[in-house]
């Protein structure tokens, strides 16, 4: 694989790990030319998933959109990008296991919320505020009460 920093064509693999129940491989690489280290991910492709938006539009599924949402939700929170990648892998795995090629955006949002709820309550509330389009402070309080009632706080 080519080094993204200097363009040298023969990098070496330092470490490989399976992710997502064997559906992906994370490789830590080093360039012998500039000594930069970087991470690559290898995943197999399945049939294309189409997302049905709330207004009825259809668009190609893009895992980067989920990752970008997680990056915002986890901003200044103690979680690594690798952990976020695992969350995205879990969500994609659930979508693929469903066997359907058309998925409503609401389902993706719910899956993200379920994963966030398990990992970080602050990120969960942040994501919920955007996903559920909170307009009033009472909506934040209600979500926090739900977490408290379920013993998650």
From Swiss-Prot:
Pfam family, one: ATP-cone
Cofactor comment: Binds 1 zinc ion.
Zinc finger (unnamed): 3-34
GO MF annotation list: ATP binding; DNA binding; zinc ion binding
Function text: Negatively regulates transcription of bacterial ribonucleotide reductase nrd genes and operons by binding to NrdR-boxes.
NCBIfam families: transcriptional regulator NrdR (TIGR00244)
Protein name: Transcriptional repressor NrdR
Naturally occurring in which organism (per UniProt): Fervidobacterium nodosum (strain ATCC 35602 / DSM 5306 / Rt17-B1)
Organism phylogeny: Bacteria, Thermotogati, Thermotogota, Thermotogae, Thermotogales
């Amino acid at each position: 694989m080519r080094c993204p920093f200097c363009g040298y064509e023969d990098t070496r693999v330092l470490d490989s790990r399976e992710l997502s129940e064997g559906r992906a491989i994370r490789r830590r690489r080093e360039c012998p030319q500039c000594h930069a280290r970087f991470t690559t991910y290898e995943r197999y492709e399945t049939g294309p998933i189409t997302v049905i938006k709330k207004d009825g539009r259809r668009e190609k599924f893009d895992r980067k959109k989920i990752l970008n949402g997680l990056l915002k939700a986890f901003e200044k929170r103690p979680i690594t990008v690798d952990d976020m990648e695992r969350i995205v892998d879990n969500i994609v795995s659930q979508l693929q296991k469903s066997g359907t090629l058309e998925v409503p955006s609401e389902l993706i949002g719910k899956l993200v919320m379920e994963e966030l709820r398990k990992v970080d309550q602050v990120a969960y509330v942040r994501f919920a505020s955007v996903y559920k389009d909170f307009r009033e402070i009472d909506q934040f309080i209600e979500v926090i009460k739900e977490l408290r009632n379920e013993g998650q706080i």
